[in-house]
Design a protein with these regions (language model features):
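C-terminal, well-structured catalytic/ligand-binding subdomain of enzymes
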Residues: 1, 17-24, 28-119, 123-128, ...
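Long amphipathic N-terminal alpha/beta scaffold segment
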Residues: 1-13
Length: 290
């Protein structure tokens, strides 16, 4: 699916790391504005958990949370996998990320169930998948050419947060791909520097991180290079809400949606700002986790 470059950043906070005492996920998604769905969808399927998230090809999900309090976000782990000649060839027959995420949201109540569900799932896409539930248990799940590694997140973890950009950070997988794109390394280090410098983070601080321009922030405007911020979000699985900003611009507004409320059909006009990308953004550098 498409010839995108690896992109996206996300951060999960334990309740002890967030100022409101809730588990939170902050997330940016980068893509091309002409191919992005720009849809938030609430899905109610008989016999499945109700969930809300942004779509890909309308049917798939790129992120979201369900009525049991499980939230899921993703970024590519290395170069994106797909059938297009410009993409990395899949190492096995299996699922694209958008099928994985929708399956988790519809079938899993919490991080523990999601990890068990993933073990039996053939995943062809190379993923950095973040799971976080309303109880404050989470995990980073990395997949690379059919291999999987997991870093759990709970109150016994060395750090009260975890994050990912577009390279492997769990050593057993990072050693298989010892280089990463410069922009991924810079975004990862930016998140770490902010998170390590504060005892707790507020929702307002997270929003500022998401909309601050790269390289001193996470927002990218390089849409022609398939690397423009199409959506920014904060998910609170405890309260069952998502705060969503389209197009990487504060001028488009942050909108709050609660899963327990109706989601009527609506449309709005947003604006984006396009800029050329510096070529050295996409060069490779050593992955410090390899």
């Amino acid at each position: 699916m498409t010839y995108l470059k690896p992109n996206c950043s996300h951060l999960a906070l334990l309740p002890s790391k967030s100022s409101n005492g809730h588990p939170l996920i902050a997330r940016n998604y980068e893509f091309n504005d002409e191919l992005e769905d720009f849809q938030l969808i609430k899905t109610i399927v008989e016999g499945k958990y109700t969930h809300m998230g942004t779509s890909v090809l309308s049917f798939g999900r790129e992120d979201g949370f369900n009525d049991q309090g499980l939230a899921v976000t993703m970024s590519s782990c290395g170069f994106p996998v797909g059938a297009d000649k410009c993409m990395r060839r899949p190492a096995l027959e299996g699922l694209q990320y958008w099928a994985v995420i929708r399956s988790l949201l519809e079938n899993c109540r919490d991080t523990r169930e999601a990890l068990l569900f993933l073990k039996g799932m053939p995943i062809a896409y190379n993923l950095n998948l973040i799971l976080l539930d309303r109880s404050g248990n989470g995990a980073l799940v990395e997949t690379l050419d059919g291999r999987m590694a997991v870093r759990p997140l709970d109150e016994t973890s060395p750090l009260p947060y975890l994050h990912a950009a577009n390279h492997a950070v769990i050593q057993e997988l990072a050693s298989l791909e010892p280089e990463a794109m410069v922009h991924s390394l810079k975004r990862y280090d930016y998140i770490k520097s902010i998170a390590d410098s504060a005892e707790t983070l507020t929702v307002s601080q997270l929003k500022s991180m998401l909309l601050a321009p790269y390289p001193n922030g996470l927002c990218c405007r390089f849409y022609q290079d398939f690397f423009g911020t199409t959506k920014s979000m904060i998910i609170d699985p405890m309260d069952g809400i998502i705060e969503l900003c389209w197009g990487g611009r504060a001028e488009n507004g942050w909108h709050t949606y609660r899963l327990s409320d109706p989601l009527p059909a609506s449309e709005e006009v947003i604006s984006i700002s396009c800029e050329p990308a510096a070529p050295d953004m996409f060069r490779f550098a050593p992955n410090p986790f390899a």
